[in-house]
Amino acid sequence: METRFGASPPYTVGVEEEFQLIDPRTRALTPKIEEVLAAGDGELPEGTLASELSASCLEVRTPAYASVAELARALPALRARVRRLAERSGARLVSAGAHPFSPAAEQPITGKPRYRKVDEEMGWPARMQAIYGLHVHVAVPGGEEAVRAVSALARHVPLFIALSANSPFWEGRDTRLASVRAKVFGLIPRSGLPPRFASWEEFVRHVERLVRAGSIRDYTFCWWDVRPHPKLGTVELRAPDAQTDPGRTAALAALCQCLAAAAEEFEPEDPLLTEENKWRATRHGLEAELYDFSGQRTVAARRAAEELVGRLLPVARELGCEAELEGVLEISRSATGADRQRAVLAREGSLKSVVDYLAEATA
């Protein structure tokens, strides 16, 4: 394994947003990825648009920004440009963790050799991955800092899931989960919470063992909720559902950036204990009661978000993302994306109406 850690300016931030491509007539997923990529050729900087496993998914990558404030200003305009490209290709753009009714297994796999190989190796779990996430990259100075940042972010994965929960429906049914995406993603190997690494060297050894065993080709086949990304010189948070509102994307990016910068303030937590809170957040979203294992107390997810923001505000001021971090408070005091989708269904009585709402709200 390449053991050098990429050099990016510390604590710069970028995101990858995975969008659903929707048939305007049926409101079902449509495998239009190749058409959208062709439409975007020359229209956007190289590398901005990418395919994922499902041909009904469009990944949009931002550049690295010096501050989350810059990211927040850029996101709406970027989304607008991508939406126009999708419309020229005969698709609508939706940002949410899962489609309300399209069968996952009916979505074609993209033609990339990497994803064809994944499909061949995994079978059914790969065919279930019609899910859409938000990935946040934060640059850190080196490998040891990356391991500490991964640890700090991992213990807060349940809170990220609660705040971002935006996938209540699966194949036409209400799952009674706030984030069905979190459970579907768990079907694939090397997903979920990362192992607890004591050092960069331990992470490298872990990956090298998996490579020698023939399980993976490189570290990018470790699809944990948060992982080091040596090539980019970042830590990558992968747990959140895709966000309909770009303001929420920016708020979650600010929380991620602050935790990465303040990683030394947070003790590592046993992943088996964090897993319990992850389940509670997956099931109940911001209505979850999370257990603080170090403080031996139960705390409501909304309260946990407020306490964490308060703790991180001095860091946010240094990073210039105070306003965006306070956006986490706005999320914690309002309905989740999952709640809003359910409210549309209750009001309109149709999952197609939920898709229409999501398409209109994906600003």
Swiss-Prot record:
Function: ATP-dependent carboxylate-amine ligase which exhibits weak glutamate--cysteine ligase activity.
Highest taxon in the source lineage: Bacteria
InterPro entries in alphabetical order: GCL_type2/YbdK_subfam, GCS2, Gln_synth/guanido_kin_cat_dom, YbdK
EC id: 6.3.2.2
Pfam families per UniProt: GCS2 (PF04107)
Species this protein is from: Rubrobacter xylanophilus (strain DSM 9941 / JCM 11954 / NBRC 16129 / PRD-1)
UniProt keyword list: ATP-binding, Ligase, Nucleotide-binding
Any one Gene Ontology molecular-function term assigned to this protein's record: glutamate-cysteine ligase activity
Catalysed reactions, semicolon-separated: L-cysteine + L-glutamate + ATP = gamma-L-glutamyl-L-cysteine + ADP + phosphate + H(+)
Protein name per Swiss-Prot or TrEMBL: Putative glutamate--cysteine ligase 2-3
